[in-house]
C-alpha cells in the first residue's frame, strides 16, 4: 500500500438531520464523495483509493439506509483505525425529535426505520441504535436551528484545508455577446466601449492572451480607469459571497466576439484575484471566429 495518507470523513447521524447538504458541502470543498455507502464496502474502496493518484480527501455517508449497518460498522471502523495510511474522523449530524418530525412532515417522506409509518417511532429507534456511534464521533453538529447555508459554513469552517478561501472558488471567464450571455454567470461586465483590436489588421487573428493584443487593450486610459473600478467593486464583496455559503462565484467579462478585449480583461482580473483567492480562468469564445471561418 502507498504511504500517502487518505483524509477520510465518515458522515452519519439522524435521518433528516442534513446529511444531503453535508455531502454536497464536502464535494464543494474538493472531497471525493459517495452517499449511502454500505459499511462492508468501505475498506475495499479505500484500498482502491490508496492505489491511485486520485483525490485522497474522501467523504462517505454511512447511515441507517443500509439495513445491515450495525452488523458491519464496528468491524469497518476497526479496519480503518488499524490502517496507518488513513486519517479519519466521524461527523455526526443530529437534531431534536420535534425538528426531525417537522422536516419529515414537510418533505412527506417516510423514515427508514418507521415500519408502521409512525415517524416518531422510527426516530426514537434510530437514535437508540446510533447512540454508540455518536459517542465515538469527533464532530457532533446539532442542526436543529441551522439553515442549510449555516450548515454548509459550519462544515467549511471545520473541514476545509489551507486558507479561508479553500472552500470558495472564483471562475473568471471571457465571452462574446454575439454568442449569448453565459447562463451560469453571477456578475457580468461589458467592455465593448474599449477600442477594438479587431480593426488592427496585425492583431485581428490574435487573442487577448497574446502579448501585443493584451498590451493594446490594457494600455488605453479607459482600460486603466475601468480596471481600477472593477477591482474596487469586486474585491470587497468576495468575503460577503463566501460568508453567504456560495462555493463558486462566476465573473464574466464580455466584448463583441469574445476574442480580444474581454479575454485580456478576464486574464488580468484572474491574475489579480489569484494572489488571495482560488481562481479558475477560462475563455469561452476566443477561438469561435476562427472555427467559424474554417467551417465556411
Curated annotation (Swiss-Prot):
GTP binds at residues 63-66. Keywords: ATP-binding, GTP-binding, Nucleotide-binding. Gene3D superfamilies: P-loop containing nucleotide triphosphate hydrolases. GO terms for molecular function: ATP binding; GTP binding. The keyword ATP-binding applies. The keyword Protease does not apply. Pfam families: PapZ_C, RapZ-like_N. InterPro entries: P-loop_NTPase, RapZ-like, RapZ-like_N, RapZ_C. ATP binds at residues 13-20. NCBIfam families: PRK05416.1. Displays ATPase and GTPase activities. Belongs to the RapZ-like family. This is Nucleotide-binding protein M28_Spy0517.
